[in-house]
């Protein structure tokens, strides 16, 4: 009984696959795709620029750079003092 039902389903699926894509799903022409490449690249560049600017502004406004700088300064001074006391 299962084989009797699965064969027609298999035939219908095979027919749909062999039919190919519908006209609305067909790939666009190469020339139209090539014409849109500069616009897409410009849009990508603008988006990337905006995101980079936003990230840089976020970093500038955060306390992370100042905290990092202070930590490095403190650590460097501690190491310098330890070296002075060790080799003096």
Swiss-Prot record:
Cysteine pairings via disulfide bonds: none
Localization per record: Secreted
Domain of life: Eukaryota
Protein keywords: Lipid transport, Secreted, Signal, Transport, VLDL
CC per GO annotation: high-density lipoprotein particle; very-low-density lipoprotein particle
Chief location of this protein within or outside the cell: secreted
GO molecular function: fatty acid binding; phospholipase inhibitor activity
A Gene Ontology BP annotation from the UniProt entry: lipoprotein metabolic process
Similarity section: Belongs to the apolipoprotein C1 family.
Record's function text: Inhibitor of lipoprotein binding to the low density lipoprotein (LDL) receptor, LDL receptor-related protein, and very low density lipoprotein (VLDL) receptor. Associates with high density lipoproteins (HDL) and the triacylglycerol-rich lipoproteins in the plasma and makes up about 10% of the protein of the VLDL and 2% of that of HDL. Appears to interfere directly with fatty acid uptake and is also the major plasma inhibitor of cholesteryl ester transfer protein (CETP). Binds free fatty acids and reduces their intracellular esterification.
Name the UniProt record assigns to this protein: Apolipoprotein C-I
Organism: Arctocephalus gazella
